[in-house]
Amino acid sequence: MTEIVKDEPRIEVKTLKTKYPQGAERCLINAVTERELNSSMLPADVGCVVDNVDTVCAICRAVMEGRPVIEKIVTVTGDGIANPQNFRVKTGTSFAELIEAAGGFKGSVEKVISGGPMMGFAMFDYHVPIVKTSSAILCLTKDVVAANEESACINCGRCVSGCPARLVPSRLATYAEEGQEELFVKFNGMECVECGCCSFV
C-alpha cells in the first residue's frame, strides 16, 4: 500500500503493531495521531474521521454507482458451526438462515454471539435480521463456554495493567454490580471502550 500511494502527498500509510484493541476508534486515533478522546467527544472534535474498509467501499458504491447499503459480508464461525464461512447477504436476512446455510449447529451449542468473542453480545433469538452493523455470528459449544466461565475477582490487578483506557476494571465492576452509579461515573466508568480485555486476564 505504501508503494501505491508514494506519489500522493495527501496520503500517508502508518504501520501499527498488531495489538488488540488497537482497531477501536479511540485507540486507533491515539495510535495514529497521539490525540486523545474521551467518551463525550467525537473523532471530528480532534480533526479525525475513522472509517473501516467496508464503510469506504459502501461510500464508493453509493457515490459512483448509486447503490445503497443493502448487503453485508458476515462471517459464520466457531467450534459449534458445521461449515464456517463468509457470506455476502442482503440486510434483513435472519441469523437463523445464515446458521442453516453454514450447515447448522455442530455439537452442543451453548452460546451464539453476534460479533466477535471480545466485543460481541449473546443472542437469545436467532430470528433477528442482519443489519448494517452486523459482522459475524460466533457459535460456541458447552466446552468452550465452560472454559471461560466467570470466576471471583482476587484483586490481582492484571485487569488494570491490561486496560487500554487506563481504568480500574475490578473497582468499576463492583460499582456496576452494586448499582453505585455515582461512584461508577466518578471513577471514569464511562471511559470504558468495552473491549473485554479485563474479562480475559
Where are these regions (language model features)?
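Hydrophobic alpha-helical positions that pack around
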Residues: M1-F95, A101-S108, G116
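Generic beta-strand/beta-sheet core signal
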Residues: K14-L16, T77-D79, K90, I113-G115, ...
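Short, solvent-exposed coil/turn elements at secondary-structure transition points
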Residues: K17-P21, M118, K142-D143, E178
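Active-site gating/interface segments in enzymes
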Residues: L28-T33, G103-G157
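Catalytic-loop motifs flanking and including active-site residues across diverse enzymes
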Residues: T55, T91-F95, N155, V168-R171, ...
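Short alpha-helical segments in extracytoplasmic peptidoglycan/chitin-binding modules
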Residues: G92, E97-I99, V112, C163, ...
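Extended, hydrophobic interaction surfaces within ordered domains
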Residues: A101, F105, I113-S114, G189, ...
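Ferredoxin-type iron-sulfur electron-transfer modules in oxidoreductases and energy-metabolism complexes
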Residues: S134-E150, V160, P164-V201
